[in-house]
């Protein structure tokens, strides 16, 4: 992909629409969507179960896919999709893999090339030793070695 714009949006349909509108007509764009996945955010902030959290990510990934395809058809903008399980470093490793796999399936584009999904794995609050984060990243790399880009993001 050539140089383009990168935009960030939470998993909210109204904001996804506005975000895609903001890059319509550019040649290339990376749309980066996120939703919080850690137990505290799931139970206290959003009052969601694991299943509801996955449903939220999958639903909004499908919206991103539909809207970016429409934008490409209308304006020619080529999109890459980046997903972050926000609060990744506080998320149970097996759940992080599960939600990323569900998002990848909903995006429906994988394999070699520019269509591969990008997983951004943020560690924004250091609550564990660095090797714990490294193990979490490794778990996702082992699952997604050939059909996704993995981008550790220690902030």
List each model region and its residues:
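Conserved mixed alpha/beta core segments that line enzyme active sites in large multi-domain catalysts
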Residues: 153-155
